[in-house]
A protein has these predicted regions:
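An N-terminal, well-structured beta->alpha segment
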Residues: 2-106, 195-235, 243
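Glycine-rich phosphate-binding loop plus the immediately following alpha-helix
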Residues: 159-189, 329-352, 357-366, 422
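Gly/Ser/Thr-enriched, mixed-charge loops and adjacent short helices
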Residues: 34-43, 154-286, 292-294
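Phosphate-binding and adjacent anionic-ligand microenvironments
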Residues: 295, 299-301, 322-324, 342-538, ...
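Conserved phosphate/anionic-ligand binding catalytic regions in large, soluble enzymes, centered on
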Residues: 39-59, 146-149, 239-251, 307, ...
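Short Gly/Thr/Asp-enriched flexible loops that form oxyanion-binding sites at enzyme active sites
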Residues: 102-110, 153-160, 310-329, 365
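N-terminal small/polar loop signature for handling phosphorylated ligands or for N-terminal nucleophile
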Residues: 90-153, 256-313
Length: 576
């Protein structure tokens, strides 16, 4: 561990800090715990880049850390040769406080290293950055965003030439390089305006939007159904103060939605997210303004995208007419089932269709895919793995991926992005809702019909939060305990197979035989139970918490719900 007191003093004495930054550090003088939490070591650069609260300090998100991280990334790009520097980087940012300043700081460092920069003139959805990297043939991409985290956070996500987030080997190369770089003296910089004049920085804007949106709109399968219900079909949309505010409504209107109602208060771009505690479409509480508007105008369907517009959540009216949240698992199943039918009806289904999901996403999606002649493949959590799998399958000529999704409200569609894309997903989910509306059904009705057809699947994710400096130790201890002393039964139901994605082992609990899985190299444990339930445990990659996923199935809705309750009670015992 770094001598945090010495590092704190070094920052205080540095000429690199301005008066406000020094005042912020002087204000915590004497607060040992706060000083330690800011200076105990540098932020760890992972495959998701960096994410943290915005404060002055080595272990925080600020302009100095952004420059330092960018210098490491620039060195890795430069190591690929002059052509890579010429291809350059695309840079994008979300609506958060400091996002624009951080993005410009990253551009200045890239330019000073002779790397060509294409930077968006203002905030854009994350999928548009992935598109820009691919469209302009860039070597890499940088996105300043903390996605759906609270307002105190910001982040730095990095992409490679395929438009996907960085593969582990490149992330490791950057992390290794950063160990050699002094945060103040080791970073090259060139003033933004000078770099523009020198032709090293160019601005991206409307032209890129048009190219991106032409790809998005080409994904439409069925305008006829939308036109059929256009006069009565009503949609409420909220961007939660973020990047979806322009392109999502444009996509829906382009689809033929006549009655689109946007939540005015949340169409205001604001990185403090004044109307919500959390700008996360996974949290139904944030939809209160959208529900009020939907009730006022008589809409049955609500869409909400997170601040960087890579994830989308929906709400629909339930059996009693009140709005209920449809989970990411359920939305994905609905969309997959719909797309298979819609693509076949439109003559757009490829010869060997594939569908990708993560290991923690509902098994109902596999059932839907395989029942309809679509091959299903699992990947680790994160769209970089799904992008990698899509690239590999298609390059080998094995088939074509029609959809990829994960349970946390992310969907990757089409061939023009390699990350989750709430713009395209919003378009196709709305097309689906209109198609069902033409049949006199809501998406709630549609979901019940799918349960009757494919089985009563149910899922629940628990977050075991472990904050503080000892949080990581507690997380490691829990994972170690589950490995060294694994449960023989869970909530009274026998564990039949125990899988460890770290080493790829699969243990048959009855015989003790050990088999090998296709996937390995990730800190995830999987317990498959005698009643068909699967429980997965993994540490979060971005926050101090252990995530526990319950994937179950019942003979009917009541049995499914009882299973979720039973296994949820067991999960709570893990931290006792």
């Amino acid at each position: 561990m770094l001598d945090y007191k010495r590092e704190y003093e070094r920052w205080l004495a540095s000429d690199a800090l301005n008066a406000d930054e020094k005042a912020e550090l002087q204000a915590i003088a004497g607060d040992e715990k706060e000083i330690e939490s800011r200076f105990y070591g540098p932020m760890e650069f992972g495959t998701a880049g960096l994410r943290g609260t915005m404060k002055v300090g080595l272990h925080q998100m600020n302009v100095h850390v952004i420059r330092w991280a960018t210098q490491g990334f620039a060195d890795v790009i430069a190591a690929e040769g002059d052509e890579a520097k010429q291809k350059g980087v695309a840079i994008c940012m979300d609506c958060r406080v400091n996002s624009m300043a951080f993005a410009r700081a990253a551009a200045e460092v890239c330019a000073a290293n002779g790397i060509r920069v294409r930077i968006f003139e203002s905030l854009r959805p994350t999928p548009e950055l992935s598109f820009a990297v691919r469209y302009y043939g860039c070597q890499a991409g940088i996105n300043v965003t903390a996605s759906h985290n609270p307002k105190e956070y910001n982040g730095y996500k990095v992409y490679w030439a395929d438009g996907a987030q960085l593969p582990p080997q490149h992330a490791a190369a950057i992390a290794a390089r950063l160990e050699q770089i002094d945060i103040f003296t080791g970073v090259k910089r060139m003033a933004f305006d000078d770099a523009v004049k020198a032709g090293l920085i160019t601005l991206l804007g409307e032209e890129t939007d048009k190219m991106f949106m032409s790809n998005v709109m080409a994904m439409v399968n069925d305008r006829t159904s939308v036109a059929q219900v256009a006069d009565s079909f009503k949609v409420v949309y909220t961007p939660f103060h973020g990047c979806g505010w322009k392109l999502v409504p444009e996509a829906l209107r382009g689809l033929g939605v006549k009655n689109l109602y946007c939540v005015e208060q949340q169409m205001v771009l604001d990185g403090t997210f004044p109307t919500v505690a959390s700008p996360n479409p996974e949290n139904p509480e944030g939809f209160y303004l959208a529900i009020d508007l939907a009730d006022k105008v008589g809409a049955d369907f609500i869409l909400g995208t997170d601040p960087d517009s890579d994830r989308v959540g929906i709400m629909v009216r339930g059996a009693d007419g009140k709005f209920i949240a449809v989970t990411g698992n359920q939305t994905g199943v609905l969309l997959l089932d719909y797309l298979i039918g819609a693509m076949r009806r439109a003559g757009k289904m490829p010869e060997h269709p594939y569908f990708l999901k993560t290991i923690v996403t509902t098994e109902m999606a596999r059932k839907v895919a395989e029942s309809n002649g679509v091959t299903c493949c699992d990947t680790f959590t994160g769209f970089k793995f799904m992008a990698e799998k899509k690239n590999a399958l298609e390059a080998a000529g094995e088939g074509h991926v029609i959809m990829s999704y994960e349970e946390s409200y992310g969907y990757m569609l089409g061939d023009y992005v390699r990350d989750k894309d709430a713009v395209t997903a919003s378009l196709l989910i709305t097309e689906m809702a209109a198609w069902y509306a033409a049949k006199g059904m809501t998406l709630y009705d549609a979901l019940q019909a799918l349960y009757k057809k494919y089985g009563w699947y149910g899922e629940k994710t628990h977050n075991l939060v472990m904050p503080g400096l000892d949080g990581l130790e507690k997380m490691a201890a829990l994972m170690k305990r589950l490995r060294t002393a694994p449960p023989a039964n869970i909530a009274g139901v026998d564990v039949v197979v125990r899988k460890d994605y770290q080493d790829g082992s699969a243990v048959d609990c009855a015989t003790g035989n050990v088999g090998k899985m296709e996937l390995s190299g990730s800190n995830v444990l999987r317990f498959e139970l005698a009643d068909g339930t699967t429980i997965l445990v993994r540490p979060s990659g971005t926050e101090p918490k252990i995530k526990v996923y319950i994937l179950t199935k019942g003979a009917d809705a009541a049995e499914r719900d009882a299973n979720i309750e039973k296994y949820s009670a067991w999960v709570k015992t893990l931290t006792e």
